[in-house]
Amino acid sequence: MDKVCAVFGGSRGIGKAVAQLMAQKGYRLAIVARNLEVAKATASELGGIHLAFRCNIAKEGDVHSTFEEMEKHLGPVNFLVNAAGINRDSLLVRTKTEDMLSQLHTNLLGTMLTCRAAMRTMIQQGGSIVNVGSIIGLKGNVGQAAYSATKGGLIGFSRSLAKEVARKKIRVNVVAPGFIHTDMTKHLKEEHFKKNIPLGRFGEALEVAHAVVFLLESPYITGHVLIVDGGLQLTA
């Protein structure tokens, strides 16, 4: 299979799990991360036909050059997954402006930039994009006002883009995870939080990855937000 899947934030967590599933299906992977060595290690684990790239998605020049390099070495990108993200938990009155901006730039602007860069070739050939959001973007949460704004904005952006490019055979969807075992949640006390989750546990990155791959490959779904949270939204 010659189709190419670019996974931004593909060196760890949900992004890495998506890359593993897509590699198993025979797609060629571009593993993109800020840390090139970690990205290379992930690409190496997947096998010889996959490549690693360094990119700071908050920088327009980085995104543009990364897409040029991916297309040069792998070919046009057919699937795009935006799984890169950061969080700076803090009550708004205590949140530094630079922390607000870093979350906005990575979680929202970065995804806008990668999606726009992908359009250059996808408009000619079609494609599928999945942006990894968060249940917090739908529910909100104390101490995560800035983070929630970025993830809520991601949903509005993705739905709008889905409308813009549907006639070009480009689909855009969102996966909104709840509490998932990743680096972002490892500091949380699971026993305290899981009592509010109907399924009684945190999810695994691979479980979210299956949802991402489902949306990537589903030809008649676009503009959808798929919640993967063990039923957490039912308790709101």
Curated annotation (Swiss-Prot):
EC annotation from Swiss-Prot or TrEMBL: 1.1.1.100, 1.6.5.10
Catalytic activity: a (3R)-hydroxyacyl-[ACP] + NADP(+) = a 3-oxoacyl-[ACP] + NADPH + H(+); a quinone + NADPH + H(+) = a quinol + NADP(+)
UniProt-listed InterPro entries: NAD(P)-bd_dom_sf, Sc_DH/Rdtase_CS, SDR_fam
Taxonomic lineage from the root: Eukaryota, Metazoa, Chordata, Craniata, Vertebrata
GO MF, one example: 3-oxoacyl-[acyl-carrier-protein] reductase (NADPH) activity
Function of the protein: Component of the heterotetramer complex KAR (3-ketoacyl-[acyl carrier protein] reductase or 3-ketoacyl-[ACP] reductase) that forms part of the mitochondrial fatty acid synthase (mtFAS). Beta-subunit of the KAR heterotetramer complex, responsible for the 3-ketoacyl-ACP reductase activity of the mtFAS, reduces 3-oxoacyl-[ACP] to (3R)-hydroxyacyl-[ACP] in a NADPH-dependent manner with no chain length preference, thereby participating in mitochondrial fatty acid biosynthesis.
SMART domains assigned to the protein according to its UniProt record, in alphabetical order: PKS_KR (SM00822)
Pfam families: adh_short_C2 (PF13561)
Annotated Gene Ontology cellular component terms: mitochondrial matrix; oxidoreductase complex
Site (Important for interaction with acyl carrier protein (ACP)): 168
UniProt protein name: 3-oxoacyl-[acyl-carrier-protein] reductase
Organism field: Rattus norvegicus (Rat)
Keywords: Acetylation, Fatty acid biosynthesis, Fatty acid metabolism, Lipid biosynthesis, Lipid metabolism, Mitochondrion, NAD, NADP, Oxidoreductase
Gene from which the chain derives: Cbr4
Binding residues annotated for NADP(+), in chain numbering: 11-14, 34-35, 83-85, 147, 151, 180-182
Top-level taxon of origin: Eukaryota
Signal peptide: none
Record localization: Mitochondrion matrix
Keyword Oxidoreductase carried by entry: yes
Catalytic residues in the record: 147
Pathway given in the UniProt record: Lipid metabolism; fatty acid biosynthesis
